C-alpha cells in the first residue's frame, strides 16, 4: 500500500513538473517574445526586431515538436530536447546584435525588458532541457503515465485546432495530418539550418547582418 501511494505521488509530481515546463514555455518562450515583437514594431527598434525575427525562426522547432508529439511520434521527444538549446543560443549568439543592445541606454524600457527576457529564457532553457531529457525514455515505450504527461498538452492543442479547422475549412485535422506537417516542416527546418551552417556561418561568422 505504501509503495502504491509513493508511486501515485511520484506520478502526480512528475506530471506537475511536465505541465510546469509547458506553462513556462507558453509564457517565456512564446508569450513574452510575441509581446516584445509587437512592442519593437510599434517603437521601431530594428535591433530588437532582428533579434526576435531570428529567434522565431529558431523557435519554430518547438512547434514542430508539438506536431510530432500529437501523433506520438518518437522523434518529437528528440526535437523537444534540442529546441530550447537552440532557442537560447539564438538570442546570445550574434555579436553585432549583442553590441547594439549593450549600447542602448539601460533605463529604456524595451531594451531593458529584452535583456531581462534573455536571462529568463536562459533559465527556462536549463529547466526545459533537464525535463525533456527525462522524456527521451518514452521513445522506446510510451505506455507509462510519465510519457502520457508529455502528450497531454500537444493533444489538447490538437483538439482545439481540429475544431477550428473543421469549422473554417470543413475538413479533418487528424493526428496523422499533424505529424505529416511536422515532418515536412522539420525537413525544411533542417535544410535551412544546414544551409546556414555550410554557407552563411563560414562567411559571416557570428554577425547577424540582414539575416
Model-derived features with residue positions:
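Membrane-interfacial loop-to-transmembrane alpha-helix junctions, especially the N-terminal start
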Residues: 47-56, 209
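Short juxtamembrane and helix-loop transition motifs at transmembrane-helix boundaries
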Residues: 10-19, 38-48
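A generic, lipid-embedded transmembrane alpha helix
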Residues: 52-72
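C-terminal membrane-adjacent module
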Residues: 120-211
Amino acid at each position: 500500500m505504501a509503495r502504491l501511494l509513493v508511486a501515485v505521488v511520484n506520478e502526480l509530481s512528475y506530471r506537475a513538473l511536465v505541465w510546469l515546463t509547458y506553462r513556462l514555455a507558453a509564457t517565456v518562450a512564446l508569450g513574452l517574445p510575441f509581446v516584445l515583437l509587437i512592442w519593437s514594431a510599434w517603437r521601431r527598434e530594428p535591433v530588437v526586431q532582428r533579434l526576435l525575427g531570428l529567434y522565431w525562426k529558431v523557435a519554430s522547432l518547438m512547434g514542430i515538436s508539438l506536431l510530432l508529439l500529437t501523433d506520438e511520434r518518437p522523434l518529437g521527444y528528440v526535437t523537444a530536447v534540442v529546441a530550447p538549446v537552440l532557442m537560447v543560443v539564438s538570442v546570445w549568439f550574434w555579436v553585432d546584435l549583442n553590441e547594439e543592445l549593450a549600447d542602448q541606454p539601460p533605463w529604456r524600457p524595451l531594451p531593458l525588458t529584452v535583456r531581462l527576457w534573455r536571462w529568463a529564457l536562459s533559465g527556462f532553457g536549463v529547466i526545459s532541457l533537464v525535463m525533456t531529457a527525462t522524456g527521451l525514455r518514452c521513445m522506446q515505450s510510451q505506455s507509462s503515465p510519465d510519457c502520457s504527461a508529455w502528450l497531454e498538452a500537444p493533444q489538447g492543442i490538437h483538439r482545439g485546432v481540429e475544431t477550428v479547422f473543421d469549422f473554417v475549412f470543413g475538413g479533418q485535422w487528424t493526428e496523422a495530418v499533424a505529424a505529416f506537417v511536422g515532418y515536412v516542416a522539420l525537413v525544411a527546418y533542417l535544410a535551412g539550418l544546414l544551409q546556414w551552417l555550410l554557407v552563411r556561418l563560414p562567411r559571416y561568422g557570428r554577425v547577424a547582418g540582414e539575416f
